[in-house]
Amino acid sequence: MVQSKEVNRDQNREKVAAPLRVSRSLYTPEQRIKRDKSAWTWIQGILAPIQFLVFLISLVLVLRFLATGEGQNIAIWSIVIKTATLYTIMVTGCIWEKVVFDCYLFAPAFFWEDVFSMLVLALHTAYLLALATDALSIEQLMYLALAAYATYVVNAAQFIRKLRIARLDHATQQAAMKQATTSGMEVPA
């Protein structure tokens, strides 16, 4: 009797957990076509590594200033340039999302990445506002920039992870289609 209850409990757990294991593709076939045909996909692919390079240079300049007190102006301006690249990639990313998913932000496929992007934008914007109004000391500005940069790194990792999952999912789908066609099974359109 005890063993029977345990088996039933395990079966119920499997039924509850089953929907959690179902993998949904990041893109529908139509969205994948839109993504592949859009010039905005290429633009995002160019801007992302540029922004990362600007981030790395700025990070070094900010850390150098905090460690030595040298290079204050270049550190300040590097953060402004990093923020401008962030705004640029956010605007072009919104356009890309509109083209592929038919909404400018918070498409289900990238909902949490977009939510976290809002924090990244808020911290970078807070830096610009504090810089313009002298609301913070130079050291406080640099630490605010580092907080903004930390959120940027997390957000970039979110996007990289999501795109890697999409690439692996697509490869799995392609392999399954190839397997189905070579075994003579009919592949749905």
Range-by-range predicted roles:
Residues 1-3, 7, 182-189:
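Long, non-globular segments of proteins
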Residues 2-3, 12-22, 43-66, 72-100, ...:
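Hydrophobic cores of alpha-helical transmembrane segments in multi-pass integral membrane proteins
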Residues 166-188:
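Short, highly charged, low-complexity non-transmembrane loops/tails of multi-pass membrane proteins
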Residues 67-73, 174, 180:
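Charge-rich, acidic-biased intrinsically disordered regions
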Residues 28-41:
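Cytosolic juxtamembrane amphipathic/interface segments immediately preceding
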Residues 20-30:
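Short alpha-helical hairpin
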